[in-house]
Amino acid sequence: MLGGLYGDLPPPTDDEKPSGNSSSVWSSSTKMAPPTLRKPPAFAPPQTILRPLNKPKPIVSAPYKPPPPSNSSQSVLIPANESAPSHQPALVGVTSSVIEEYDPARPNDYEEYKREKKRKATEAEMKREMDKRRQEDEERDKREREEREKERERDNSDPSRLNISGEEAWKRRAAMSGGGSGGKGRSSSPPGNVDGFSIGKSETSGLGVGAGGQMTAAQRMMAKMGWKQGQGLGKSEQGITTPLMAKKTDRRAGVIVNASENKSSSAEKKVVKSVNINGEPTRVLLLRNMVGPGQVDDELEDEVGGECGKYGTVTRVLIFEITEPNFPVHEAVRIFVQFSRPEETTKALVDLDGRYFGGRTVRATFYDEEKFSKNELAPVPGEIPGY
């Protein structure tokens, strides 16, 4: 077809050849070639790719090689980056041991952190202390068990020790402490059947009876000095025959009395108290001779209110002191206590009248409520003799 189209043209001659270089003709023709057949320029434009930190070598495309001549019209295309191995950056993972990651939604509090740290330290200290105590208790229990086992083994190995009484054991101990001398060693304890000395029923609580009916050390000592039951102490038996007892007179005070005298005084006091209750009961109680002139302080009101509070509800406490010269000392200080009910006042009067308070005998009587409400606290004429 091509031959038929251009067959009538004459062949080219040397004069018609262009004077220019043939490379320009080919260069212009190569511009029209496909992009895959174009020869890359000598200076390629810089490639804009994201390079990693380790800066790998850039990928350089291989120069274009023309395919070998062949009769077939098919052409083989070779990719430019086929010969160059692909280099990809290696990612190295960094692991970190983060205990608590920061959360912007929940801000931390320094004070709370300090309290939490202090609490954990306290708990750790308490745990160590408890472990230490538990270990000490276990060691102590272990030692006690070992000692009991050793004691049990000694008792089992010597059965004759269980067949002696307490008196014989005491004599043996006295003989051992005396150096083994039987002639002039320590004197043995007196027998239990001393004249006037009854071990079975002793009224004195200070001496008592030993285990198994044996005499105690106090009984042996007293019997050794010649004491007999019912006799007074001393060489001429002029001492006391009954023990001394402590009698409580106040919340912070007391006196020492004889046991028999205490019983008799208690009976007499009960009789006197029953006689002193006269007149119509009121809610106001008058206490006299509880303290002397000049002894009133700021704590006296609270002390009286607290002492009278065990009889009922105390609503008011007033202290009235008379400072006139030559006034009776036992009437100079008058303490008024108001209760909520007359029954409580009666109960307080029965317990406080005749009671000892700081070495003084307290006198308690009922007082008129109308006078107390009007603050008429001074004694009326004729109430106190000589006033």
Swiss-Prot record:
Key word Nucleus present: yes
Q: Where is the G-patch domain?
A: 214-260
GO BP terms: abscisic acid-activated signaling pathway; DNA repair; mRNA cis splicing, via spliceosome; red or far-red light signaling pathway; regulation of photomorphogenesis; regulation of photoperiodism, flowering; regulation of RNA splicing; regulation of seed development
Indicate the segments forming the RRM domain, all copies: 283-369
What keywords were assigned to this record?
A: Abscisic acid signaling pathway, DNA damage, DNA repair, mRNA processing, mRNA splicing, Nucleus, RNA-binding, Stress response
Instruction: List the biased-composition ranges (Low complexity).
Output: 19-29
Using the UniProt annotation, give all residue ranges assigned to the region (Disordered).
1-213
**The keyword DNA damage appears for this protein:** yes
Q: What happens when the gene is disrupted?
A: Reduced sensitivity to red, far-red and blue lights associated with precocious flowering (in both short and long days), lower chlorophyll and anthocyanin levels and reduced cotyledon opening; these phenotypes are related to defects in gene expression and pre-mRNA splicing. Defective in abscisic acid (ABA)-induced stomatal closure and hypersensitivity to ABA during seed germination. Plants lacking SWAP1, RRC1 and DRT111/RSN2/SFPS have pleiotropic phenotypes due to altered alternative splicing of many pre-messenger RNA (mRNA).
Show the GO cellular component annotation of the record.
chloroplast; cytoplasm; nuclear speck; nucleus
What terms describe the molecular function in GO for this protein?
RNA binding
- Chief subcellular location equals nucleus
Q: Basic and acidic residues compositional bias: what residue ranges? A: 103-158
Swiss-Prot/TrEMBL induction comment: Induced by osmotic stress such as long-term treatments of polyethylene glycol, salt (NaCl) and abscisic acid (ABA).
InterPro entries in alphabetical order: G_patch_dom, Nucleotide-bd_a/b_plait_sf, RBD_domain_sf, RBM17, RRM_dom, RRM_dom_euk, SPF45_RRM
Where it sits in the cell: the answer is: Nucleus; Nucleus speckle
The entry's note on the tissues where this protein occurs is: Expressed ubiquitously with highest levels in dry seeds and in cells surrounding the base of trichomes and guard cells.
User: What is the stated purpose of this protein?
Assistant: As a member of the SWAP1-SFPS-RRC1 splicing factor complex, modulates photomorphogenesis by regulating the gene expression and pre-messenger RNA (mRNA) alternative splicing of a large number of genes, including those involved in plant responses to light signaling, probably by helping in the 3' splice site determination. Associates with and regulates EARLY FLOWERING 3 (ELF3) mRNA processing, a key component of the circadian clock also involved in photomorphogenesis.
Q: Tell me how this protein assembles.
A: Component of the SWAP1-SFPS-RRC1 splicing factor complex which modulates pre-mRNA splicing to promote photomorphogenesis. Interacts with SWAP1 in a light-independent manner. Associates with the photoreceptor phytochrome B (phyB) in nuclear photobodies upon response to red light. Binds to the splicing factor 1 SF1, involved in 3' splicing site recognition.
Protein name according to UniProt: DNA-damage-repair/toleration protein 111
